[in-house]
């Protein structure tokens, strides 16, 4: 079974018209715990491939609202055991790298995704995001990739930008551009999902 793990109902609306018989759709809610839980539920239900798509924020000044990207690796940038064991931000005890590798189809430019449990205009995260090579940020993708890796299930992620750092308050951009980003995501989705 191919399963889609999607954070928000507005994003799930993009997916529904393209579901094939036998596909699963799991609307998780926002955040890493919700996404991880829904991903495990999908795998327990028989998913042998997990797909995630949705809107996200960009951190490369060359990026534009409604640009679409495949994700080739993801990191949980708010997971930090450095004071406990000296590991790099994002590295879990059982791993040697902060990155979870993802499959891509080569249809859109590939980027590194950083996932954390906050939506913020704060500048505080910028140094760690830059150090990790993150150019796109969301609140779910790395958690989905993490659960997939733990279960040996392939995962693909597609993101469309609703906001870009340095081009105004990200919260204001998100609110103003969500519909445009969802439209762009819907145009990119059919080829990417393989329908």
Predicted regions and their residues:
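Glycine-rich phosphate- or other oxyanion-binding loops that anchor nucleotides, phosphorylated ligands
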Residues: 2, 6, 11-195
